[in-house]
Amino acid sequence: MTKKTRAKIPSPRERPFLWGIFLFAAFMLGWTACGGKLPEQDVVLYNRTASLPIGFYLRIPFAASRGDLVTYDPPEDVLAFSYAHGYMEHEKAIFLKRIGAMAGDTYGVDKNGNFYVDGNYVGPVSITDSKGKPLPQIERGVLHTVPEGEFLPLGDSTQSFDGRYTGTV
């Protein structure tokens, strides 16, 4: 008669090692699928600002449309302003925002500081940030049109430093 044996369940000390092997295998599989080359850009991003929900985001190329989350390199003056005011921890950073308006859409700030896209109210525009420092302003009372090849970035929070202050990118 053969003796039955019970399958060995990994101990709590062995589990991190097994997870490490699993993650390494998944990485190698993905790396091989990419032709053995690492991607030229970050694929996984972590957002720690309140302009969008805090957490990890996967960056993949796609044909973007209004409302989609996108990453982009902000213009140098916007990046310098963000760093100088403590919005970003590094002088070189990628922004993560939603596409609030696309080529041909209109946007503007009325005389009362309300921001609109295609005539729809989006939220208020502040003159100062939460620390009382002045924010850049787009001209009030003027209707702007998003140029071809550009978009207007908007965060989910009304306190997001985004296209309400910087215009299109």
Where are these regions (language model features)?
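Residues that line or immediately flank small-molecule/substrate-binding pockets and catalytic motifs
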Residues: 74, 103, 129
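Structural motif
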Residues: 68-70, 105, 150, 156
